[in-house]
């Protein structure tokens, strides 16, 4: 074997080793690129999932806020309507004839007399004549008419010495009825 053949064999061996190294390097680089592609795909999927979740969360918050705002507006409107009904009822009671107010004062004073047998009653200026007519009756001789009160109707009763007072104004009774029946009224009106 000549020198030329040995050189050719060395060259061939070098080429084979170089080809093997290149093939191994190619496999390594392909593997690294595949792993990188997998990582990129995973990161991309996580980012898409996170952004989808965040978008859903923001959308849900916005919907909740909008629903709350609408509900608040509905409740404010309903409260406004109920307040109008309340004030309208007080106004309609005030328009009732003098005979109604006289009877009401008589019944209220009869009830109050159980707790305050003598004293002073106050009513609004509109009902003074009705109150005087009731006080003229013998059973109410222990009561006198005081200064007019700023009430919608009914009476305020003050015991002798002013220590005991009872509020039998229409608004007080209306408030009791209103508070006890407000939910029922709301359910009927607004379902």
UniProtKB/Swiss-Prot annotation:
Q: What is the lineage of its organism?
A: Archaea, Methanobacteriati, Methanobacteriota, Stenosarchaea group, Methanomicrobia
- Which GO biological process annotations does it have? proton motive force-driven plasma membrane ATP synthesis
Which family is it part of? Belongs to the V-ATPase E subunit family.
Membrane topology, as annotated: Peripheral membrane protein
Q: Could you give the subunit structure recorded for this chain?
A: Has multiple subunits with at least A(3), B(3), C, D, E, F, H, I and proteolipid K(x).
The residues forming the signal peptide are none
Cross-referenced SUPFAM superfamilies, in alphabetical order?
V-type ATPase subunit E-like (SSF160527)
InterPro entries the record matches: ATPase_E_C, ATPase_V1_Esu
Instruction: Spell out the subcellular localization from the entry.
Output: Cell membrane
> Which of UniProt's keywords are assigned here?
ATP synthesis, Cell membrane, Hydrogen ion transport, Ion transport, Membrane, Transport
What this protein is called in its record is A-type ATP synthase subunit E
Q: What does this protein do?
A: Component of the A-type ATP synthase that produces ATP from ADP in the presence of a proton gradient across the membrane.
| GO molecular function (one) | proton-transporting ATP synthase activity, rotational mechanism
Q: GO cellular component terms? A: plasma membrane; proton-transporting two-sector ATPase complex, catalytic domain
């Amino acid at each position: 074997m000549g020198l030329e053949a040995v050189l050719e064999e060395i060259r061939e061996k070098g080429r084979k080793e170089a080809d093997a190294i290149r093939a191994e390097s190619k496999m390594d680089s392909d593997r690294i690129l595949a792993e990188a592609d997998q990582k990129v795909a995973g990161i991309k999927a996580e980012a898409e999932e996170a952004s989808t979740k965040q978008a859903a969360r923001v959308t849900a918050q916005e919907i909740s806020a909008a629903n709350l705002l609408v509900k608040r507006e509905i409740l404010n409107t309903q409260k406004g309507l109920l307040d109008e009904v309340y004030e309208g009822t007080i106004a309609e009671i005030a328009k009732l004839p003098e005979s109604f107010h006289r009877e009401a004062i008589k019944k209220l004073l009869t009830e109050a007399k159980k707790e305050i047998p003598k004293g002073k009653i106050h009513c609004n200026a509109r009902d003074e004549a009705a109150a005087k007519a009731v006080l003229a009756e013998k059973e109410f001789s222990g009561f006198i008419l005081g200064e007019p009160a700023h009430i919608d109707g009914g009476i305020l009763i003050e015991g002798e010495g002013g220590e005991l007072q009872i509020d039998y104004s229409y608004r007080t009774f209306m408030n009791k009825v209103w508070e006890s029946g407000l939910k029922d009224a709301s359910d009927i009106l607004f379902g």
